């Protein structure tokens, strides 16, 4: 193991000084030892990928390596795995699989890649390799979710190994790395389509749904993260037990899926986006289950009520492991809910959220939209969404939505929606002016809508009355941005700050070739958009 006294990490939007976290602790709360282990896991995954490719492994023979690539890349996302013991175990499993592949194929086992080689590479090479690596982490998260529902794509799995192996090429320059970055976006589009199909074929097609923010009296559990499969398992095990279930954060869109909303004890949504959890959970008389990411170091006020599962882990927290068949026993979580008892009386929280405007729902009213635009009743669309975060500059997105023309519609997705989804902006032609399309991976749905509208108007996507205003925080946002660039979508407004890992040289390419635009103020940006 390397030097655990210091770290280097600049993969998230809140990285220290907009340059990188160094020293003993990162802004996200992970310790230097954790950051070092995450780098070691990544370096081991590069070695596994190189060994798998040398062995010419494909299909089912590569299944264990594929699963480790998904799990390992996911575990190194921001706000996922803070547990050194869990990461050390993962590292050992990656090494064991690499050695097994090498032995069975009679090829040499590739050595671990030292991430310091990447962090200390020439500026533009470091920037482009970081785009590839962080994009792969986001892509792997979506592949992990699809695989949990039994949906896999060999082309996606194969590319994870291809992309990882490419990181070890110290001679790769911009001519190699920029196309590779865009290929991450191409494969991520394919993976988001896979996950969309997995979700809709398993849980039904999302439909517009109103979700209460109030909590009923009695025992309950709050589920955070993104994992619909884990939520379904918990709903099955709590049915008839007198324990209600509430979503949090990115799981709000779960209420729109027919196979989930049929559970009478899936009651509503507690709280808002991930960065507010230390306040929102402080006095909660219920346990919280974290699925996938969005975990912050728990405050002492509620640490004894935190459960984790899947790739999420934190030292000292109860972790629910998956059985070999994929099942999970949530009985300890349920018992904790019964012990805590919930609220003695229903909360007086007012207001509702509306979700479920996925691509099927929006395309179902496409004729209305097209007619409204042609008749001048609708000036256009704004897609305002992405990751939320704690930086004060994120108030931009609420201000932007409030100042957008009254005859425009706001599409939104991911947890960035919580900046403004409490607003009542009225309707246009019977359509709500704010339409929540779902989780971050539902960017695929937004792309489908854009392509369909372009066909209806007989124009290119860039010619539509559609502007993308995106907030980013972690690596899934990177993979989505790369998908949009792969599709040739131009004029994307990005904020609240630019990624620290994007060098001036790479930024120049993004601005010149793709017209990526750092946000300024809502007033100035709207003036430019509407000119």
Region roles according to the model:
Residues 45-205:
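Electropositive, gly/pro-rich neighborhoods at or near active sites that engage anionic ligands
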């Amino acid at each position: 193991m390397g030097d655990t006294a210091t770290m280097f990490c600049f993969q998230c939007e809140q990285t220290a000084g907009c340059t990188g976290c160094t020293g003993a602790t990162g802004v996200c709360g992970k310790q230097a030892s954790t950051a070092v282990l995450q780098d070691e896991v990544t370096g081991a995954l590069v070695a596994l990928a190189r060994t798998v490719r040398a062995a010419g492994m494909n299909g089912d023979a590569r299944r264990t390596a594929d699963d480790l690539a998904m799990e390992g890349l996911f575990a190194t996302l921001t706000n996922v795995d803070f547990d050194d013991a869990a990461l050390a175990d993962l590292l050992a499993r990656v090494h064991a699989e690499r050695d097994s592949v090498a032995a069975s194929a009679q090829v040499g086992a590739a050595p671990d890649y030292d991430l310091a080689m990447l962090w200390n590479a020439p500026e533009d090479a470091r920037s482009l390799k970081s785009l590839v690596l962080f994009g792969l982490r986001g892509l792997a998260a979506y592949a992990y979710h699809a695989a949990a529902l039994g949906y896999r794509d060999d082309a996606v799995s194969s590319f994870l190994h291809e992309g990882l192996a490419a990181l070890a090429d110290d001679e790769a320059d911009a001519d190699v790395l920029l196309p590779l970055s865009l290929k991450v976006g191409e494969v991520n589009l394919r993976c988001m389509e896979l996950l969309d199909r997995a979700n809709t074929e398993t849980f039904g097609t999302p439909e517009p749904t109103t979700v209460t923010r109030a909590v009923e009296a009695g025992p309950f559990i709050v589920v955070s993260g993104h994992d619909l499969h884990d939520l379904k398992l918990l709903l099955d095990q709590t049915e008839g037990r007198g324990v209600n279930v509430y979503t949090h954060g990115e799981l709000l869109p779960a209420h729109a899926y027919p196979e989930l909303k049929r559970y009478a004890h899936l009651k509503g949504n507690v709280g808002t986006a991930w960065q507010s959890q230390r306040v929102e959970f402080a006095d909660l008389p219920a346990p919280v289950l974290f699925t996938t990411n969005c975990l912050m170091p728990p405050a002492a006020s509620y640490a004894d009520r935190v459960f984790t599962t899947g790739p999420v882990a934190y030292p000292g927290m109860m972790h629910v492991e998956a059985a070999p068949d994929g099942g999970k026993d949530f009985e300890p979580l349920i018992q904790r809910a019964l012990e805590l008892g919930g609220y003695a009386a229903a909360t007086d929280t007012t207001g509702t959220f509306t979700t479920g405007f996925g691509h099927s729902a929006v395309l179902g009213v496409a004729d209305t939209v097209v007619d409204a635009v042609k008749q001048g009743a609708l000036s256009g669309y704004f897609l305002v969404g992405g990751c939320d975060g704690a930086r004060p500059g994120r108030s931009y997105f609420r201000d932007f939505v409030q100042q957008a023309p009254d005859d425009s519609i706001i599409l939104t997705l991911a947890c960035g929606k919580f900046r403004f989804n409490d607003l009542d902006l009225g309707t246009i032609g019977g359509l709500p002016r704010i339409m929540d399309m779902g989780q971050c991976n539902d960017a695929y749905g937004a792309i489908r809508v854009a392509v369909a509208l372009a066909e209806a108007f007989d124009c290119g996507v860039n010619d539509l009355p559609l502007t993308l205003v995106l907030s980013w925080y972690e690596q899934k946002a990177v993979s989505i941005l790369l998908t949009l660039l792969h599709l040739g979508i131009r004029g994307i407004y990005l904020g609240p700050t630019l990624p620290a890992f994007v060098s001036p040289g790479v930024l120049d390419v993004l601005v010149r070739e793709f017209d990526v635009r750092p946000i300024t103020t809502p007033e100035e940006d709207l003036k430019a958009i509407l000119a």
